Amino acid sequence: MVANNIPDDRSYTDEHEWVMISPGQTSVPSTPVRVGITSVAAAALGELVFLDLPDVGSDIEAGQSCGEVESTKTVSELYPPVSGKVTSLNQAAIDDPSLVTQDPYGTGWLFEVQATQLGPLLTAEVYAEKNGA
């Protein structure tokens, strides 16, 4: 763990998303990877009330908006850290968006992707430094 509970077992984006890809990994994983938002994003958003996630089977592109998270404060777009095909959604989080803010790195994950290409990724340490975490 790095400061502000930023787990160091995954990679991050400047847009405050994480992906379960080992830091420094440059090859595309052969199995689907989980995607979620960071604790920094969750804290800034506050109480989440709605998740608009990409459909299973849809193709998404790293860095291009693929959905939204809506809180009592604002609506924020989701920018996936990888390109690929969405293989599953976290139905528990869709049914109860508070899971995303309560446990963004565990039960609050958003969706899984069979990645075809990695976007620009950061280590936990770099992400924490950039975000004062």
Regions found by a protein language model. Give the residues of each.
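Acidic, low-complexity mobile loops and tails
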Residues: 1-65, 98, 103-133
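Residue-level recognition of beta-strand microenvironments
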Residues: 19-22, 72, 89
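Short glycine-/small-residue motifs
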Residues: 32, 68, 89
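Short, charged/polar surface micro-motifs in flexible loops or helix N-caps
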Residues: 42-43, 85-86, 92-93
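Short, charged beta-turn/beta-strand-edge "cap" motif at the junction between a beta-strand
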Residues: 66-67, 72-74, 92-93, 117
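ATP/adenylate-binding site constellation spanning eukaryotic-like Ser/Thr protein kinases
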Residues: 80-83, 115
